[in-house]
Amino acid sequence: MSETIDTLETLLIINSGTGVLQQCFVNFPYPITGAARWLRDIGFCLWILEIVLFGFFTGMLAWRYITHPVLLKKNMMEFPTSSFLGAIPISFNTIIQGIISYYDYRTSARWATFALYWVALVMSLVISFGLVIYQMSHAKPQKLSDVAGVWVMTTVPLFVTATTASSIVPFVYMESTKCAIALLVTGFMAWSFAIAEVTMIVTIYFFRLIADKTPQAPLMVGSFLPVAALSQGAYAIQRFSIFLATYIKNGYAPTQVNPPPLSQATLLATSEVIHWMGIILHLFLIAHATFWVVQGTTSILMSLPKLQFNIAYWSAVFPMASYANAWCFLSRDLRDDGMRGWAATMVMIATLLWLFCALETAYRGFWLGSLFSAPGLEDWLGDGEQEQDEKSRGGRKDAWNGSYTMPPPGSQDEESGQANGHQSSEGDSRRRN
């Protein structure tokens, strides 16, 4: 794995951080009315910026893979940096969340988000399951030191998709109960899959931090990425619990008849229990995320002398914005002033971090021209051409990664008895006869 990771794939993480930050302004813990509504307007501007960046970067990435198909294969086998492809469904999901945040009063917007959700779900499954399976079956053998926080990006898309489902389900419920239940079930299943996957990945990553030397300086910022997964999961499960509690409170019971077989008091008590279960799970996951915030901050402070700005810094914006957004929603639900203040502080930190990365990216990338690069791109293209050449000449295909290996010079001659200019005895006898 290269020491720098300023490739086109990593640029997509800019969209993810921008998209979640605009959600922080939408869910800001203090009432947004009157003059304070400018926060929501800033969030809308960030949402438009995210759409533009998403179209630009995704279009560039698609063009690269269309013109050079070998790069897609090579990138998917480059563990763990191939996990940055997870930024595509993440950004797509935050765009969907923006639609329902700013146009929730429109029926067309509700149905549009419902349709786009299924596209996002398929994209997330391709990354969270397809990419992992591909890495298991095709990537080179890895050492423990190769594991980095970037690997968590394979499971974050499912969490963000669950967040999308939890955000749009109350509005789709206004149009169709069946569609809302479909969102609830599939969104909760995505959340459950993501919980199982992130538990395994984070456990391996934590063991790697203890048992092996610290990651390379450019990859240290990836220590924050577990924060993104856990924070998105916390936000999603609380919103699911609120919707399910409301649904039960309105008279639903599993053995549905009219009137319901359970009393209204029982339904109200059940809905309150479910709501508080969501809050407890939120607190559990956000506490776990807080541990990784402390761990990531400590790692960055210890590596400051070696760190230079690169696109990987955006890997900290997305997790911190997700962390702030989770606290914002929790503080609004519990109506606790202390939590509101903490959530507002985290939003400010995430905003300052976004501004720092944006200014550094503009200065180093567009002014100095020293930021955007694709290390090893020429080598990858050359390797692809060499593989095609070896394939055409009858090279042996390696099963573990699909590449071709040519036999040593003269080996085929030795097998037929013709090495070093000597012919086989069988051939000599034919000529004598």
Please report, for each region that a protein language model flagged, where it lies by residue:
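Intrinsically disordered, low-complexity terminal tails of fungal membrane proteins
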Residues: M1, L377-N433
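Juxtamembrane membrane-interface segments at transmembrane-helix boundaries in membrane proteins
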Residues: M1-I5, P29-F44, L72-S83, Y105-F114, ...
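N-terminal signal-anchor module of multipass membrane proteins
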Residues: M1-M60, T67
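The first (N-terminal) embedded transmembrane alpha-helix
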Residues: D6-F28, A87-G98, V152-S167, I195, ...
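Membrane helical hairpin/interfacial module
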Residues: A36-R110
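C-terminal functional regions that serve as terminal interaction/effector modules
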Residues: T58-M60, I279-S299, S315-G402
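Membrane-interface helix-loop-helix junctions at boundaries between adjacent transmembrane segments
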Residues: K73-T81, I100-V156, S166-W191, I210-P218
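Membrane-interfacial loop- and helix-cap regions that link adjacent transmembrane helices
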Residues: I168-V169, K178-A182, G187, A194, ...
